[in-house]
Amino acid sequence: MSDFAKLVGAEGPVTVVGGRTRWHVGGKVHPDAREVHAPSGVMSYDPAEMTVTVRAGTTTTELTAALTEAGQRCALPERGGTVGGSVVIGENHPEVLGRGWLTSSVLQVTYISSEGRLIRGGGPTVKNVSGFDLPRLIVGSLGTLGLVEEVILRTNPIPPRSQWVESHDADPFTVASRVLRPSAVLWNGSSTRVLLEGHTPDVAASLNSLTSIGAWSEVDGSFDLPQHRWSFQPAELNGCSGTFVASIGVGTAWRDEPQPRPALSPSVIEISTRMKNNFDPTGRLNPGRSAF
C-alpha cells in the first residue's frame, strides 16, 4: 500500500486538494470532507519513447519545464494547478489540435479507490494494453471515481516553428477548413487567431492559404482565456455575447461566467449513477462534486 493510499484510507468523506485553480468546477465539496494532498514529482521520463511518469501533485509548471528541456510538450493545459487536477478536470490545452486530446494522452493512471486500494489501469504503451478504457473514465471525472496518485502521459516534440497570426475579417469556420492542420483556431467574436506549427515551409504554405480569406498579421500568442470552460455546438456561437473565446473545431469556449448545467436525459442519469455506485458505493470521494 502506498503512503497516499494510507492517507486516503477507507472510510469517511475525502477530497484531494491541488492548486485550487479549478476548485469552482463541478460543485462545492462537502465541508466535512477531509482534505489530502497527492504526492508530487516527475518519476521517470524517456524522451525517446515520448512518455513521462508523473505524480498527481506535481505542478503543470514543473512538468512543462522538464519536457521543454528535452524539446517536448504534452496535452495538459498550462493554466496553473497540478497534473492530477488537470487530468480529473479533463480540460484540453487550447492548442489541442496540435498537441492532441487529453483522453488519448493519458496512457496509464494509478488511483486510490473508495475502499482505499491502489488501482492501476492502462500502460506505458498503447499496444497490448488491457484496461486502456479506465484512464478515459478517470479523465474528467472530477475525482468522483478515484483519487489519482500517478499518471503516464504521452509527450510529443515541440515543432521547429510556431507562429500565431490574427485576422479581423476572416470567418473562423472558413479558416478552420482552409488550413490543413492548424494547432489552434480561436475566435473572440471580432478577431480570429490561428496557431500554425511545423517546419518553416509548412508554416509558410499554411499562411499563404489564409491570405485569400482575410488580412493577417503576426501576434505574440493566444487570446487571454476567461476562467470558465463551456461546451457548445457551432450554431450556438451566432448568438454569443459578452466576453468569450471559442476554440473552433473543438466545441469548447471560455467565458467569464460558468455554464449552466444542462438537463440530462434519464438514460444519462441512470448510466452515471450506476457508474458512480460501482466505483464509489458509499459516496466518500469528493462528495458534492459531479462531472455532469
Question: What does each of the following model-derived ranges do?
Answer:
Residues 195-208, 212-217:
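Terminal amphipathic helices with adjacent charged low-complexity linkers/tails
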Residues 1-23, 261-266, 290:
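N-terminal accessory segments
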Residues 16, 76, 183-189, 244-248:
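Short beta-strand
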